[in-house]
Regions:
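Primarily recognizes the serine-hydrolase "nucleophile elbow" in alpha/beta-hydrolase
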Residues: 182-260, 421
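Sec-dependent signal peptide cleavage junction
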Residues: 23-33
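Short beta-strand element of the alpha/beta-hydrolase
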Residues: 89, 103-120
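C-terminal subdomain of alpha/beta-hydrolase-fold enzymes, centered on the catalytic histidine
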Residues: 330-500
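A domain-start/cap signature at the N-terminus of enzymes
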Residues: 32-103
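Alpha/beta-hydrolase active-site loop
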Residues: 163-186
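Non-catalytic, alpha-helical, charged scaffold/linker segments
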Residues: 240-244, 248-370
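Cap/lid segment of the alpha/beta-hydrolase catalytic domain
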Residues: 116-171, 210-212, 479
């Protein structure tokens, strides 16, 4: 398969032998070699060459969809993996392409590559299989599917050493992208049209993947794994309810939920006096961060209050144009639901006149959505949250990752190093030099999703839009913390951007 590469040169000649790969890798990976020596065993070195004959031909029938496909499964995507249970990828191709047929407007060379991950809670994740609804429906659309696995916060090796702490998961996803680009001439699909998809922590990692393309911060980690010497930027991002911007998530959460003192999650409860005080302290820290982003109202916003390019700011009390923008987005969401026939008459905090949603009481809406987490929501003072666990080290399970929680810690907790914290936040890279950002973004966050503050995806989407990226952002009405609930719309978006 031939490809025309524009403005890019191939970094590596296709078809090199495994021996050559080993030589190149050993010359550039002294740190990883030392680490392997310490583990007292030499891991197998894997070829980065795609084996196009190592597949099974399968057929799946679900509902109206019958898909005949080739399954290339458990492909190790780095030459020197730390954990072959997770650093693997499943690759699925519609058999019709091998029969010389096209599907819709796609051929074996032009089909976009759907790149879904199954990561949740920053846990390790196996690659998605054909049983995953998004995978088999993507195949039915004519996409090629490359589903990567990745290490996570609880991954350990045989000696009990932590191997999946930050930034392991994003490094693994980048390595999988590099494998696809490395083998683009022999693998079906177009590696210049990779569309990543994920939910929750998986959505955060798709956003991070899209925002950090080719940034040098990740290079030492990729080199140590023996990742292909290729670019790792991607074409597009589909991110559902991303649990991202973790080092600012606590202050954003309390800006939204401060004053809501009851919470509902695994147990129902009421905030203590100390927690209420912490909530107030965190809330007051948010305006300074928000204002530092210098966000502006994106184009195509139709509001009597907010005009295009109006600065989105907050005063010391947490009020201002950014809050009005959040309100506008919620109002638009409610209007879409109302237009589709949803009965909103029981919601007394919504004002409806002449079939138009004219006002939403934001404070009453937040009470309706309810608080889920106690403050701090992410960097827990006892250092026991999933996110504390994410920012551990090889030998330390949990660490703080904000100065506030470190200074107010109820345990003898250490503070994570600055670089891993930076590397897990896409907001740090959107305007960074030497970084290739995905051009197309689709971000969804349900209106009653309480796992993180609504401010988090709004800031991400707005920062991207302000930098002239193509952003499709929406807040689906009455949707909680979930993803892939609108696959038909997602695939329509993919088809539209892939046609250009």
């Amino acid at each position: 398969m031939k490809r025309i590469w524009k403005n890019r040169a191939k970094n590596i000649i296709m078809g090199i032998t495994a021996v050559t790969t080993l030589v190149i890798f050993s010359m550039n990976s002294h740190a990883e070699t030392a680490k392997l020596d310490n583990q007292k065993e030499q891991e197998e070195v894997y070829s980065l060459q795609f084996n196009e004959n190592n597949y099974t031909l399968q057929t799946l029938s679900k509902g109206d969809h019958v898909v005949k496909y080739r399954a290339y499964e458990n492909i190790v995507y780095v030459s020197n993996p730390v954990d072959v249970d997770y650093q693997i990828m499943n690759f699925y191709v519609p058999e019709a392409y091998y029969e010389g047929k096209n599907i819709a407007n796609y051929s074996i060379q032009t089909a976009p590559i759907f790149f879904p991950n199954q990561i949740g809670g920053y846990n390790p994740a196996k690659p998605a299989t054909i049983e995953n609804e998004s995978v088999y429906l993507a195949l039915a659309q004519g996409y090629v599917v490359a589903a990567p696995g990745a290490r996570g916060r609880t991954t350990k090796n045989g000696e009990g050493i932590n191997t999946g702490k930050a930034p392991a998961a994003i490094v693994d996803l980048k390595a999988a992208v590099r494998y696809l680009r490395h083998n683009d001439e022999i693998m079906p699909g177009n590696a210049e049209k990779i569309i990543a998809n994920g939910t929750s922590a998986g959505g955060a990692l798709t956003a991070l993947l899209g925002a950090t393309g080719n940034n040098k911060d990740y290079e030492p980690y990729l080199s140590n794994l023996g990742a292909a010497n290729e670019y790792d930027d991607i074409f597009a991002v589909s991110s559902y309810c991303p649990i991202t911007n973790l080092d600012n998530a606590d202050i954003a959460y309390e800006w939204l939920f401060n004053g809501v003192n009851s919470y509902k999650w695994r147990e129902n409860g009421t905030l203590t006096e100390d927690q209420i005080k912490i909530s107030q302290e965190l809330k007051t820290m948010f305006p300074s961060y928000l204002n530092s982003l210098e966000l502006k109202v994106p184009q195509n916003i139709h509001s009597e209050i907010l005009k295009e390019y109006t600065a989105l700011l907050l005063d010391v009390n947490g009020n201002g144009t950014f809050k009005e923008y959040i309100k506008y987005l919620l109002l638009s969401s409610a209007q879409r639901a109302f237009d589709k026939g949803e009965d909103l008459s029981s919601l007394t905090w919504i004002t409806i006149k002449d079939k138009k949603i004219t006002d939403i009481d934001l404070n009453k809406f937040v009470n309706y959505a309810t608080r889920m987490k106690t403050p701090p929501a992410f960097d827990s003072l006892d250092a026991k949250s999933f996110e504390n666990n994410l920012f551990g080290t090889e030998t330390i399970d949990n660490q703080h990752f904000t100065n506030f929680s470190k200074n107010n810690s109820t345990v003898e907790g250490s503070l994570a190093e600055a670089l891993p914290i930076k590397m897990m936040n896409p907001m740090n890279y959107i305007e960074a030099k030497g970084t290739t950002i995905s051009q197309h973004w689709r971000i969804r966050h349900g209106s009653i999703d309480r796992d993180t503050s609504l401010a988090i995806p709004v800031m991400l989407a707005t920062k991207l839009a302000n930098n002239q990226y193509n952003v499709d952002f929406a807040i689906p009405w009455n949707i909680g913390h979930e993803g892939n609930y609108d696959l038909e719309e997602l695939f329509q978006w993919i088809n539209e951007i892939s046609a250009n």
